[in-house]
């Protein structure tokens, strides 16, 4: 235990929390250019072809970003916006693509949870 005098001279240091999304550099989203768009398979109990883009960000980082929703229009050199949020069954994928912004189209035919996929409200 430190004495009060010791604490007055040198206060206790706060523990630093390590960021889960270091490439965002404390920003809510970042813009980047797709360098590669590909599919990959998830970890053990799951089975699928998950859509992933390798993205070179404006701050120089290169990260993998998950493309959510059914179907997408992304290809190499597409400019996209990424946000934080990992994909539990894809190791190394710690970012999500923001659908419906920049070059990434929203999911068409989406009726529920539309705001997460950049889908407009259906007519009628």
From Swiss-Prot:
Modified residues (3-methylthioaspartic acid): 89
GO MF term list: rRNA binding; structural constituent of ribosome; tRNA binding
A Pfam family this chain is assigned to: Ribosom_S12_S23
GO CC, alphabetical: small ribosomal subunit
Matches recorded under InterPro entries: NA-bd_OB-fold, Ribosomal_uS12, Ribosomal_uS12_bac
Keywords of this entry: Methylation, Ribonucleoprotein, Ribosomal protein, RNA-binding, rRNA-binding, tRNA-binding
Domain of life of the native organism: Bacteria
SUPFAM superfamilies reported for this sequence: Nucleic acid-binding proteins
One GO BP: translation
Protein purpose: With S4 and S5 plays an important role in translational accuracy.
Record's subunit section: Part of the 30S ribosomal subunit. Contacts proteins S8 and S17. May interact with IF1 in the 30S initiation complex.
Family: Belongs to the universal ribosomal protein uS12 family.
UniProt name for this protein: Small ribosomal subunit protein uS12
Record organism: Hydrogenovibrio crunogenus (strain DSM 25203 / XCL-2)
Gene: rpsL
């Amino acid at each position: 235990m430190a004495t009060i005098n010791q604490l007055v001279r040198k206060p206790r240091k706060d523990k630093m929390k390590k960021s889960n999304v270091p490439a965002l550099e404390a920003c809510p989203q970042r813009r980047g250019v797709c360098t590669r768009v590909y599919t990959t398979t998830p970890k053990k109990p799951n089975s699928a072809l998950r859509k992933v883009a390798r993205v070179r960000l404006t701050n120089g980082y290169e990260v993998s970003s998950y493309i959510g929703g059914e179907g997408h229009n992304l290809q190499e050199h597409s400019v996209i916006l990424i946000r934080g949020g990992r994909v539990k069954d894809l190791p190394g994928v710690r970012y999500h693509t923001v659908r419906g912004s920049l070059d990434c189209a929203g999911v068409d035919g989406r009726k529920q949870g539309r705001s997460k996929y950049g889908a407009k409200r259906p007519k009628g």
